[in-house]
């Protein structure tokens, strides 16, 4: 039986209807089978850069940037023997013959997608088991294939896993996972938020709405892990995922289309009109000046509408500039204008606006330590919004026309090449809707 009465229509990234009258809970991370697959595969999937390993060994470039160890060069035809190596990796990683282990060659064997069996994830305390097991299997497969002796085995290890375990992360490694090691988490339950925005953008091949969707799915699923989306707050997060992340009722698409030649301000005007029309808000009182103060008929739904408007405003503004740097100020001043225009709270009840203040400073103000693409929901600057700010950053980086020093191509090439091979990572809107269709009559 459904807990919530809300029904939504789901549209794709091109504004095409996918399914209608879908119960809100059908897109819940706890019930939707596609989101379940995404979360499971995020934890069990590892990208292995065989071309990188081969090049690293050939030059003895080991352990990270500017590190060379003359005399430790190994000239091994790793890519040429990718199929043999992949078979050996699968045999070592696999637990049972018919389990869900998957080892797939990409780009003619230059990269591998290694998905460890789910049983390894279930029987481990944390998700780093996938990187460690895939890395160990890759090391052994290379040693066995080329009969590497005991004196050069450590060189192979360093080419694969980098400086680990001297470092807490995998500095200089040629294996990569979406999820960073748990020791880097800012707080409990932040694992799914600890994914670079650029990783998400590269995985969705810079499709704006799909990038925002994947970001929203990961962010909002994390809210269920941290305890934020429990009880009285569950519906707030489900509606946020639906309207901002999954383009429910085609709201984001409609707002962008209506304001294709507009500004952040015109998006806000369109949003307020739509919210009144859909009976989400109403006029509370009118001042002598004619200024109208609004109140929500449905607080959680208003937040979802405001979040959808925030994404639309980001797309309109950054899309006009084709430069992602303005995303922080867009998130900030969209909320500022919205609050002044309506008398209502901004997205995430002020947390998105507050996040944007720090985000502006640390992404391009006096400090300017890094572009928007290297931020994530676990970052000390952008962690404060409960899942509503980062989807806008993903959209902005998808629209960027190469202005960023930290571009998806530079920071996330391997992750993008490998993870984009998984259909429901590349096109989450479509596949989450399909998952919802499978279960909607059971709710």
Curated annotation (Swiss-Prot):
Keywords: Methanogenesis, Transferase. Coenzyme M binds at residue 367. The keyword Transferase applies. Its cofactor is coenzyme F430. Coenzyme B binds at residue 369. One of its GO terms (molecular function) is coenzyme-B sulfoethylthiotransferase activity. This is Methyl-coenzyme M reductase II subunit beta. It comes from Methanothermus fervidus (strain ATCC 43054 / DSM 2088 / JCM 10308 / V24 S). The gene is mrtB.
């Amino acid at each position: 039986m459904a807990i919530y009465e809300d029904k939504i229509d789901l549209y794709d990234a091109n504004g095409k209807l996918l399914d209608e009258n879908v119960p809100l809970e059908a897109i819940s991370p706890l019930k939707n089978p596609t989101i379940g697959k995404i979360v499971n595969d995020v934890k069990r999937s590892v990208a292995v850069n065989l071309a990188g390993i081969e090049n690293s060994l050939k030059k003895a470039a080991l352990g990270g940037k500017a590190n060379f160890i003359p005399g430790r060069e190994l000239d091994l035809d790793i890519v040429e023997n990718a199929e043999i190596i992949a078979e050996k990796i699968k045999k070592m990683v696999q637990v049972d013959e018919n389990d869900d282990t998957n080892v797939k060659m990409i780009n003619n064997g230059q990269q591998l997608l290694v998905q460890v069996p789910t049983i390894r994830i279930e029987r481990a305390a944390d998700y780093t088991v996938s990187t460690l097991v895939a890395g160990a299997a890759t090391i052994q497969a290379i040693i066995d294939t080329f009969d590497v002796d005991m004196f050069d085995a450590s060189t192979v290890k360093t080419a694969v896993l980098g400086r680990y375990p001297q470092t807490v992360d995998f500095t200089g490694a040629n294996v990569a996972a979406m999820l960073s090691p748990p020791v880097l988490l800012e707080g409990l339950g932040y694992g799914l938020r600890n994914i670079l925005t650029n990783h998400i953008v590269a995985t969705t091949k810079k499709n704006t709405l799909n990038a925002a969707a994947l970001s929203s799915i990961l962010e909002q699923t994390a809210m269920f892990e941290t305890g934020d989306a429990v009880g009285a707050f569950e519906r707030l997060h489900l509606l946020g995922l639906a309207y901002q992340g999954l383009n429910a009722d085609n709201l984001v698409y409609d707002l962008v289309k209506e304001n294709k030649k507009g500004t952040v301000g015109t998006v806000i005007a369109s949003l307020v009109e739509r919210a009144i029309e859909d009976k989400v808000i109403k006029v509370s009182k009118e001042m002598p000046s004619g200024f109208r103060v609004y109140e929500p008929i449905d607080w959680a739904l208003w937040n979802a509408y405001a979040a959808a408007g925030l994404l639309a405003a980001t797309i309109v503004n950054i899309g006009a500039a084709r430069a992602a740097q303005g995303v922080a100020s867009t998130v900030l001043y969209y909320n500022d204008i919205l609050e002044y225009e309506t008398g209502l709270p901004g997205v995430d009840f002020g947390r998105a606006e507050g996040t944007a203040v720090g985000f502006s400073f640390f992404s391009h103000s006096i400090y300017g330590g890094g572009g928007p693409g290297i931020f994530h929901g676990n970052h000390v600057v952008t962690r404060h919004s409960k899942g509503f700010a980062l989807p806008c950053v993903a959209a902005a980086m998808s629209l960027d026309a190469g202005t960023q020093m930290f571009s998806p191509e530079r920071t996330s090439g391997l992750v993008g090449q490998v993870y984009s091979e998984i259909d429901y990572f590349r096109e989450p809107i479509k596949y989450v809707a399909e998952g919802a269709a499978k279960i909607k009559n059971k709710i």
